[in-house]
């Protein structure tokens, strides 16, 4: 009966540097933390607060412009209003948390808390992007294909869509950086 026998090879321990052995995983973690935390707009920092306020303001402007239009009965426009309201609420709540963290000088680098930020940013980014794309498609249909911009306030719709895309862009930056932070925790 031919059976292979496993060979056991001892694993060598790397030599200690200066009397202290630093495992390779810890050396990598230190390098990743250095790459992540150097001035990036993360939760609980001034840059993160500015990014959240930018998200909030652009979503609020998009919402306000859509409310100024008398009739937005198209489903995509209703979806844009709902998505911008959700984006406003999420960004405002995250801005309040950032202000709290800055005032009491607390770190928001708890893995559970950061994972909630990642999921919330991902969901709101997806919803805002979908709403902005759907509304942009309707505007292309109204403006270019059936030429009904004389009867509709296309400029207002376009301004709201631009602000929704700007809000999506800022929340996407927030999502990517927070996801990167989660990977290093």
Curated annotation (Swiss-Prot):
Keyword Metal-binding carried by entry: no
Major localization listed first in the record, in broad terms: membrane
Compartments, record wording: Cell membrane
All ranges on the Cytoplasmic side of the membrane: 1-45, 98-121, 182-185
Record key words, sorted: Cell membrane, Membrane, Transmembrane, Transmembrane helix
Listed transmembrane segments: 46-66, 77-97, 122-142, 161-181
Family matches, as InterPro entries: CASP_dom, CASPL-5
Sequence ranges on the Extracellular membrane side: 67-76, 143-160
GO CC aspect terms: plasma membrane
Pfam families attached to this UniProt entry: CASP_dom (PF04535)
Membrane topology: Multi-pass membrane protein
Record-stated family: Belongs to the Casparian strip membrane proteins (CASP) family.
Subunit and partners: Homodimer and heterodimers.
Protein name: CASP-like protein 5A1
């Amino acid at each position: 009966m031919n059976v292979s026998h496993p060979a056991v090879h001892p694993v060598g321990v790397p030599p200690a540097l200066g009397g202290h052995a630093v495992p390779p995983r810890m050396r990598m973690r230190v390098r990743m933390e250095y790459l992540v935390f150097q001035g990036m707009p993360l939760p609980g920092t001034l840059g993160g607060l500015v990014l959240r306020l930018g998200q909030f303001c652009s979503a609020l402007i998009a919402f306000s412009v859509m409310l100024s239009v008398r009739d937005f009965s198209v489903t995509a426009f209703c979806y844009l209003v709902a998505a911008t309201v959700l984006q406003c609420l999420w960004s405002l709540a995250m801005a309040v948390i950032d202000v709290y963290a800055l005032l009491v000088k607390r770190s928001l680098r708890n893995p559970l808390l950061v994972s909630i930020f990642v999921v919330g940013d991902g969901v709101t980014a997806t919803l805002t992007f979908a709403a902005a794309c759907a509304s942009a498609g309707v505007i292309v249909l109204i403006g270019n294909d059936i030429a009904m911009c004389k009867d509709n306030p296309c400029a207002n719709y376009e301004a709201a869509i631009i602000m929704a895309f700007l809000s999506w862009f800022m929340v996407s930056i927030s999502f990517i950086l927070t996801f990167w932070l989660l990977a290093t925790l």
